[in-house]
Amino acid sequence: VKAGPAHGSVSDTVVVGPRTTGEEYSGRDGALSVPTPVVEDAGIRIDGRADEEAWSTAAVLTSFTQYEPVEGQPAAQPTEVMVLVDQSAIYFAIRAFDDVPDGIRATLGERDSFTRSDDYVRVVLDTFNDQRRAYVFSVNPMGVQHDGIWNEGGSAGRRGGFGPPVDDNPDFLWESDAQIADWGYLVEIKVPFKSLRFPEVEAQDWGIQVTRRVQRNGFESAWAPMTENIPNRLTQSGRLTGLLDLDPGMFLEINPVLTGNRFGALDENDRFVHGSADGDFGLNMTYGVTSNLTLDATYNPDFSQVEADAGQISVNERFALFFPEKRPFFLEGTEVFGMPRQLVYTRSIANPIGGAKLTGKVGSLNVGYIGAGDESFDAGDPDTYVNLFRVKKDVGQSGSLGAVYPDRTVAADHYNRVLGGDARLVLGRRYTVTLMGAGSFSEDPDLGAAESGRMLYSRIERAGRTFSF
């Protein structure tokens, strides 16, 4: 199970919760630093009602500002966000008021599928407060979930590349529910600390942003005002302060897989003759080494339940086809291995015997390692062994420097190795420069002499609402 309840309901008498006595923080007035209310045990049931007494002590985020289609105007529809934490999780209750409740768009559908069709609210948590990477949790008025990782430094396909490229492949463990009423809708969210990575320090601050989209008119608003004149949206977020002694608890997930099969065939007398039974065993494990480092391991993984690839035409193609990664083992921590131009293609590990992966962040250094054995489909061919190292260091407010080293070895004289580096620099408040270089070294005696190649890449972007590139 990857998520809690994701079922909304329609009600004219939905409880909107007790009136909070907590402080209000107006985004439009610049009250963007929020001391986080802490309760011993919230005892909150995620049912889309927010009627527990614990909500009365929550901090309230108010006064959203529109950023689409008109920037800087007060939000046309009011939104209030209540937030608090207890020993094990962070909670949100979001009241999305709407003066045309019949115009609320909401469908009960698949996870991660509604952001282009439904109204929704979105919580963005920058747990390392580094303004580079954040968790995204979105919920529509029916309680359906969308989650992913927000990565600064790439193009999202909007004007001038403004906006985060949200990777919605990762699925996290969290709960949501919602209720639609005659005044709008209410969303409740619970995110356990064990589902998040964050620094191992006694006291910490998190970046926070809450946004809302009204689908019928395309209006988008945010608690912390945002402008396209600044290239990094996470630098425009608010702060949750005073988070003390957060304990993610022990995170250990073990998923054994056992499959069996038995074949039979008709003999010459048209009798069905069964063969001997056969079986296979596999194991997947995820372990939280610390609150900011995760170890994944797999043995003989079974990917039969993974979503099938969309069909592609392979006739008269000069280049190899590209397929997105959907296998769970390779999805954890994918943001660590991302680069301006893709050098890491884990789908080339087609039939893994086993593997291990370590991803996370230590101080200002992002680290990632993948090691795997790839079994040959042909009995006469040797197996392949893959090692991948990646480091990326935060530089300045939004910049970074990184290096990557993928190595694929079949035998001592059969290999492909790549060494690459990348940099992202933010100049002033509007310009972003991205640089990347890599060298490839291959040897295969069956095809002749060793080969090598190089690539260089650069990009400059200007953020702006009226002029961008």
Language-model segments: what does each one mean?
Residues 410:
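Long, charged, mostly alpha-helical binding arms that flank functional sites
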Residues 361-363, 428, 463:
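Short strand-coil-strand connectors
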Residues 276-284, 351-355, 382-390, 398-406, ...:
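Transmembrane beta-barrel architecture of outer membranes
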Residues 211-215, 459-465:
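C-terminal, active-site-flanking charged/polar segments
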Residues 1-394, 399-402, 413:
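Structural preference for beta-rich elements and adjacent junctions enriched in aromatics
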